[in-house]
Amino acid sequence: MERAMEHLNVQLNRLTRSLRRARTVELPEDSETAVYTLMPMVMADQHRSVSELLLNSKFDVNYAFGRVKRSLLHIAANCGSVECLVLLLKRGANPNYQDISGCTPLHLAARNGQKKCMGRLLEYNADVNICNNEGLTAIHWLAVNGRTELLHDLVQHVTNVDVEDAMGQTALHVACQNGHKTTVQCLLDSGADINRPNVSGATPLYFACSHGQRDTAQILLLRGAKYLPDRNGVTPLDLCVQGGYGETCEILIQHHGRLFQTLIQMTQNDDIKENMLRQVLEHVSQQNDSNYQRILTSLAEVATTNGHKLLSLSSNFEVQTKSLLRIIRIFCHVFCLGPSSPNNGNDMGYNGNKTPRSQVFKPLELLWHSLDEWLVLISTELEKEITDTTRSSSGNDIASLFLKKQEVDHSVSSENPQLLLDASSVMKTPEVYADGQDVISMIANRLSAVIQAFYMCCSCQMPHGMTSPRFIEFVCKHDEVLKCFVTRNPKIIFNHFHFLLECPELMSRFMHIIKGQPFKDRCEWFYEHLLAGQPDSDMVHRPVNENDILLVHRDSLFRSSCEVVSKSSNEKLKQGIAVRFHGEEGMGQGVVREWFDILSNEIINPDYALFTQSADGTTFQPNSNSSVNPDHLNYFRFAGQILGLALYHRQLVNIYFTRSFYKHILGIPVSYQDVSSIDPEYAKNLQWILDNDISDLGLELTFSVETDVFGTMEEVPLKPGGTTIQVTQDNKEEYVQLVTELRMTRAIQPQINAFLQGFHTFIPPSLIQLFDEYELELLLSGMPEIDVMDWKRNTEYTSGYDLQEPVIQWFWEVVENLTQEERVLLLQFVTGSSRVPHGGFAFLMGGSGLQKFTVAAVPYTSNLLPTSSTCINMLKLPEYPSKDVLRDRLLVALHCGSYGYTMA
């Protein structure tokens, strides 16, 4: 009985202690259960509770548990629970026990910077030289995290400070890579090998440069680190340039002066990213004026050498062109970062007024002189070609031209004659060079590339938007030769004569040649320059910032769109457009296309009085009375923005304008024929005046017209004093042109100006002038007719369908019998746009570029309608049992389901 009472008291005492401490007071006998009971206490460093539980327990403190098989000592070291750590050590915990990854408690304490735990572990003979499975010791962890204060305590216990991990990396390697200056100094003071290579031959300096660690690189160099490549020949400088680490590169050059020329020569290495190289040279040049002058002078010398190589027919044209233009781009970039100086067009010393800053261009004058000599000699030969009576003499003269040029150019590079034209090779291959035209065509590309370089150098010294007087003079001087070049090879315009797009005064000289090039080539040139410097404009492929989404309302699309576009950044709109209709989930390219499509219809909505329908009933012209809408000019500006945005992002709009309005956009003067779009009868009268002699008709016309101004007829002069100037047979053409401009331009000039202000926000005038009014209509609105055969040819099938399937054959039979309006509805239903791109269905765009019209099979159920995924131009067509059912369901979908989006 007494024993029973005693046992009961023990139980009650245990219960009381447990309840008071809110935990168990005895460890379970099962080790797995026991360790998970102790672990949270160890993590919280509740050493008294742990001590009490271990007091009368047989629990093995070295018991390994969990996936990585760690002991409680690992947990204490990892969490910094120093009291529990000491308790466990006193109870026999093994300080060198390794978990499944080979880590000891000391590794974990070092990794997490647990200084007190490290000290206690060392007191209990923790081995600092143990490596984990990756070969990392405790000092590697300290080096990775820059725990210098702990490293001082630990390094005295280390037998080999250069112990290597599995990749042959020492603690010094990783400290340099991570930029821990004091850690690097501590390791070096402790005898670390400053030039020790890892398995790939990379030294600590190599590691510092690979991550742009300027300060650690400087410490190493000051301590005598050698400049060594790895086993693949990659040097620390290579790494600095590849990463764009200008500061680290500067340190290398300070300690190894020879590397400056190595850096300059890297401008010719196409494997190095140009933007990284520019970044490095930009930093180095900005340190002092000496660096700035030296870099630019050296770049100019390298460019001159490359330019003369390019002028040699024995060199690789593609390689040398790319190299020259790359060097010149870098040169101009660095030059523009220099100190500002008066810029009056003479900065290159064209009139003997050289500034110190312009002296860096001096080496290039040799190349420009050679270019000028070439063009003069070719001009002379072309003149002879016109007067020569035999072709052989022309060929001989061209061969003489090469001989003469070699004599001139040998003065530039007498030490390396291979850089220049090999005249002997010209003479040895008369079958190639006998025709002077062939020789000129061969050298034209090379000279044109040098001309491009010359323009870049001239432009970088001029204020933005101004053309260098020297370059204009150069083009005018060699006008005939340059026109000869582009006539023989029009591709030169698109490849090298980019200056035409930036110099209106020069563009007019070549416009007739440019307009003669294929529309496709001009489109490519247009978009190449329009999108230059812009990232991928397809917002579908990157996360969309909610603040950048254009949230619009279907029931007030015009006004809500105008409001959100006006609040948006133009630069962000150029980068990409994301549209969401209020209350709808769908987003993506299909929604963007629909937005442009519907919005273009709203622009010509009579309620806004912006545009009026022309006489042909299909095109629109700005409304001269649009001022009835107080915000009409703001709305015209918005309309211009929308058309500019659509063209920028290659989206089609569902609107066609009069030819005269397209001319206004292009800056082309209107003609009297354009009047027919708004007043056909009046246009006929103007035509009659031009076609007939009016001398004796007694028309009594003056250079003025009567017009209704707010209900009152007023006489408006067509030019100053026009009311008193009679229209005669001699001046009737001027009269017709002026009256045309009054009706077609002056009457709507404010509207045109507002529209163009918005349009030019996204489309520069210099680019749009590459096209005529018919081509502009194609660019903006696509093909007006839908070619079913072209549609069929450029359709793909999936999910079990192919062209031979009965359902597909029925589908095309139905499409062929649809009205033009129904075909437009079908196209809009599937693609989100009611227009076919220029070039036909083969150029349909999807969310990721070109995406053909696709028909996918869907299992049929009664009354199931076709659906679509507009982002990928896919029609999901059920497997209908007959053509009649297919036609019925398709028409229901088209007439009732053309608008509205849900998530696919």
Curated annotation (Swiss-Prot):
Enzyme class of the recorded protein, top EC level: transferase
Transmembrane segments: none
EC number: 2.3.2.26
GO function terms (MF aspect): small GTPase binding; ubiquitin protein ligase activity; ubiquitin-protein transferase activity
Domain HECT: residue ranges: 569-904
Principal subcellular localisation of the protein: Golgi
One GO CC term on file: Golgi membrane
Catalytic residues as annotated in Swiss-Prot or TrEMBL: C871
Entry keywords, A to Z: ANK repeat, Cell cycle, Cytoplasm, Endoplasmic reticulum, Golgi apparatus, Membrane, Repeat, Transferase, Ubl conjugation pathway
Xref: SMART domains: ANK, HECTc
UniProt record, GO biological process: atrioventricular valve formation; cardiac ventricle morphogenesis; Golgi organization; heart looping; membrane fusion; negative regulation of reactive oxygen species biosynthetic process; protein K48-linked ubiquitination; protein ubiquitination
Listed pathway(s): Protein modification; protein ubiquitination
Any Pfam family: HECT
Keyword flag RNA-binding: no
Keyword flag Transferase: yes
Reaction(s) catalysed by this chain's protein: S-ubiquitinyl-[E2 ubiquitin-conjugating enzyme]-L-cysteine + [acceptor protein]-L-lysine = [E2 ubiquitin-conjugating enzyme]-L-cysteine + N(6)-ubiquitinyl-[acceptor protein]-L-lysine
Subcellular location(s) per record: Golgi apparatus, Golgi stack membrane; Cytoplasm; Endoplasmic reticulum
UniProt-listed InterPro entries: Ankyrin_rpt (IPR002110), Ankyrin_rpt-contain_sf (IPR036770), E3_ubiq-protein_ligase (IPR050409), HECT_dom (IPR000569), Hect_E3_ubiquitin_ligase (IPR035983)
Ranges of the ANK repeats in the UniProt entry: 34-63, 68-97, 101-130, 134-163, 167-196, 200-230, 232-261
Function of the protein: E3 ubiquitin-protein ligase involved in Golgi membrane fusion and regulation of small GTPases. Acts as a regulator of Golgi membrane dynamics during the cell cycle: recruited to Golgi membrane by Rab proteins and regulates postmitotic Golgi membrane fusion. Acts by mediating ubiquitination during mitotic Golgi disassembly, ubiquitination serving as a signal for Golgi reassembly later, after cell division.
UniProt cross-references to PANTHER family, sorted A to Z: E3 UBIQUITIN-PROTEIN LIGASE HACE1, HECT DOMAIN UBIQUITIN-PROTEIN LIGASE
Protein name in the entry: E3 ubiquitin-protein ligase HACE1
Species, as recorded: Danio rerio (Zebrafish)
Gene encoding the protein: hace1
